[in-house]
Amino acid sequence: MESKSDASVATTPIISSSSSPPPSLSPRVVLSPCAACKILRRRCAERCVLAPYFPPTDPAKFTIAHRVFGASNIIKFLQELPESQRTDAVNSMVYEAEARIRDPVYGCAGAIYHLQRQVSELQAQLAKAQVEMVNMQFQRSNLLELIYNMDQQQKQEQDNMSFESNDLGFLEDKSNTNSSMLWWDPLWTC
């Protein structure tokens, strides 16, 4: 048989001397709903499909996409995609929606056309610059060849001109290596 003292000992909690507080319940974190749920005025579920892509700090992002595509179409589209592609899809939808709002007729296609036209104009400018560069290189090579030819011609003229004046004002032949035969030496000695 059990005594009353044994039963009371078993139900009383043992308090340790380390004085640690009993585990308390963590305070419930209240997160603000995503921008999509705020705009749609609905409760944001824990597994909201739109929450990772439309943060509460950027409501304009969802507003723009919602105006053009509608919330149900955005949700359906995201549910059909794998999670790895959803971020790019949302960014693309927002870009397309912004383009459609700016240009209701052409939308994104108008921006693409404008960019393609810029690319073709820049390619034409690049081709023109490359042609000018080739012409300048050709002119440079012609100029260098002309300078080289002129330099060679001057050297030949200096080599051809074999007479220079000496200190006495007479001309002597520098090309002749035999220094004993000068032109003023008499041919006949008496």
From Swiss-Prot:
Record-annotated LOB domain positions: 32-133
Span list, region Disordered: 1-27
Biased composition (Polar residues): 1-11
GO cellular component, one term: mitochondrion
Summary of the tissues where the protein is detected: Expressed in young shoots, roots, stems, leaves and flowers.
Pfam families reported in the protein's UniProt record: LOB
InterPro entries xrefs: LOB
Domain of life assignment: Eukaryota
Similarity annotation: Belongs to the LOB domain-containing protein family.
Protein's name in the database: LOB domain-containing protein 1
Source lineage: Eukaryota, Viridiplantae, Streptophyta, Embryophyta, Tracheophyta
Name of the encoding gene: LBD1
